[in-house]
Amino acid sequence: MRYTEVIDRLYVGSCPLVPKDIKELKKMGITAVMNLQTDADMLYWRIDWDKMTRTYEKSDIKVYRYPIRDEKLEEGISLLDSILAEEHKVYLHCNAGLNRSPTMAVGYLVKKMRISRHDAARLIMSRYYCEPYLDIIRL
C-alpha cells in the first residue's frame, strides 16, 4: 500500500489487498476505513471481501463501503464528514489511490474548509502524488 496523511486524521491511499495490510492500518492508528471500490474493482484485484471484513472487525476498525466510479461525490463527502465527526482516524481508498479517493478528499476540503477545488487539490498533491478529477467537483 502507498498512502499519506493529507490532513489531520485523514489518510488517502491505495487499497488494502490482504489482511496484513489491515494490520498495518491498525498500527498507524486508523479507526475507520472508507472504501470507494466497486464490486468489479474487488473482483479485478481478487479481494476476498468477507475475509477482509472479518479482519477489519478483529482489528476494531470500522469499515464503510461507498462504491463509486467517478461521480456521486456529494453523498460520499457527507459520509466522510460524518465518519470524521466521530473523531475517527480515517483511511480513504479506491484502487491505486490516484483518482477517486483524492477526488473525494478534495471535495471534502472544498465543502468543509470552503476553499477552491484548485487550492484543495494543491494542498493534497503537495503531500501525496495523485491526480484528482477536479472537473467532477461541483459543490
Give residue spans per PLM region:
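Short beta-strand/loop segment at the start of cytosolic alpha/beta domains
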Residues: M1-T4
